[in-house]
Swiss-Prot record:
The gene is ribH. One of its GO terms (cellular component) is riboflavin synthase complex. SUPFAM superfamilies: Lumazine synthase (SSF52121). It comes from Thermotoga neapolitana (strain ATCC 49049 / DSM 4359 / NBRC 107923 / NS-E). This is 6,7-dimethyl-8-ribityllumazine synthase. Its EC number is 2.5.1.78. Pathway: Cofactor biosynthesis; riboflavin biosynthesis; riboflavin from 2-hydroxy-3-oxobutyl phosphate and 5-amino-6-(D-ribitylamino)uracil: step 1/2. Belongs to the DMRL synthase family. It comes from the Bacteria. Catalyzes the formation of 6,7-dimethyl-8-ribityllumazine by condensation of 5-amino-6-(D-ribitylamino)uracil with 3,4-dihydroxy-2-butanone 4-phosphate. This is the penultimate step in the biosynthesis of riboflavin.
Amino acid sequence: MKVVQGDYRGEGLKIAVVVPRFNDLVTSKLLEGALDGLKRHGVSDENITVVRIPGSMEAIYTLKRLLDLGVHDAIIVLGAVIRGETYHFNVVANEIGKAVAQFNMNSDVPIVFGVLTTDTLEQALNRAGAKSGNKGFEAAMVAIEMANLRKKLRRDFLEPHSNSRQ
C-alpha cells in the first residue's frame, strides 16, 4: 500500500494570501495568523504574496487572476462574513464557498478556504485568535501541507519511474 501525504516544510513554496479589507478588525488578525504560520514553517517573505481586496466577493475575481499567473504553489483565501439583518450574508457566504470549491475542482493549485462565516463579531474575533485559535494560522498549515502533497503526487505519479513497466 502506498500512502502519500503532505508535510509542513514551507521552504521554497510560493504562497498567495487573499484578504479583504472589509471587517478589517477580524481579517487583519487572520492575516497575522496566516503570515505567522507560513513564516514559522519556512516560507520566506519573498515567496509570500499578500493581495488586499475590498471584500470577500472580490476574492472570486482575484483567485482567477492568480491562477492564471501560475506562479503559486497554493492560495489562501481569508475573510470574515458576519451575519447582518439582510440576506446579503447568505449570498456572500454561499458564493465565495462555491467559487473556492469550483476553482479547487478545476485547478492544479490548492486553494484554502479561510473565510469565517459567523453570526456575530464576537464569534469571528474568537476564531481570529481570541478564544478558538487563529483560523488564519490553520489555513496556512493547510496551504503548506496541500502544496507539498501536490508536489508529491506529481513526483510519484506523473514523473516517469526508471523501473516502471513498459
